[in-house]
Amino acid sequence: MLEGKVVVVTGASGGVGRAVVRILGEKRAKVALIARGETGLAAGATEVGAAGGTAKVFPADVADHRQVEAAADAVEEQLGPIDVWINVAFSSVFAPFDEVEPEEYERTTAVTYLGYVWGTRAALRRMRPRNKGVIVQTGSALAYRGIPLQSAYCGAKHAIKGFTESVRTELLHAHSDVKITMVQLPAVNTPQFDWVLSRLGRHPQPVPPIFQPEVAARAIVYAAEHPSRREYWVGGSTAATIIGERIAPGLIDRYLGKTGVNSQQTDEKQPTGVANLWEPADEDRDYGAHGSFDRRSKDRSLQVWLSQNRTRLAAALLTTATAALALRATRRR
């Protein structure tokens, strides 16, 4: 479904974005990779080509709307009209709220929230006149439920969800055929936990259970191919978080108050490498898609399979039920 399509991916140099572009290469898409880290971008482009796709890199800081707009222009000049735009890029700070500096809050918000705004804006300016196209927002269970030590990131993810809902309703009002969908992710094993700006005493980690970036990437690409659903949840932990927040938010407050700080740290010392909030960590080194938690990470999710195959599953259950009723009726005769 994506063969020959022009697909833009922000945050494409590492982590989930890197895993996404590799899958797009396997689908023989024309992939535009946007990020700051040029070494990671170059390695990602090589992987796309090796997988069978076409790749072009467009170094840009998504927090700057001028750079995003210029990148979108360059994509259409070099690859053709943009069919799909996938927002993945983000940054964060791991620290208690009162230890985060104002400029760090501003920067996290500019990258993680406004980066999606500028990407969506650039995509819509090109898609709406053509009345076709797909925008995929990479979200998180933390778009529904805030946790300690990540107030800037959680606030940005909540903002993306509200922003996306607003834009979707405007597209529906205009009877536009442009689709916008959101994929809410669980904890993912990405390099971000090695390069995030952190003031914790120990090495930050995703809140278990942890999934490999390919699990997230497959769900994101699936959403790009099936954008009519307004939202996708990835992993049973994401579903449990969202449903739990709806049913018993106060209980989750108390639970996270007791467990949320320790569950986001290992017993190892804090990394001493570059923090990517201000400068790309992968400017001179390629980190790839995976972080430091391969041994503890799951490479598949039953919940994702059930979500993507619910129509076939329902049909199979209906067929089974019908057959059972028919057999029962036959026996009564």
Segments from the language model and where they lie:
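Conserved glycine-rich cofactor-binding loop
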Residues: 6, 13-14
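Active-site helix of classical SDR
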Residues: 120, 156
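Substrate-binding pocket helix/loop in short-chain dehydrogenase/reductase
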Residues: 96-97, 101-106
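The beta1-alpha1 cofactor-binding region of Rossmann-like NAD(H)/NADP(H)-dependent oxidoreductases
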Residues: 39, 60-70, 102
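Conserved glycine-rich Rossmann-like NAD(P)H-binding loop of the short-chain dehydrogenase/reductase
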Residues: 29-43
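SDR active-site lid
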Residues: 173-268
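Residue(s) in the substrate-gating loop at a strand-loop-helix junction
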Residues: 140
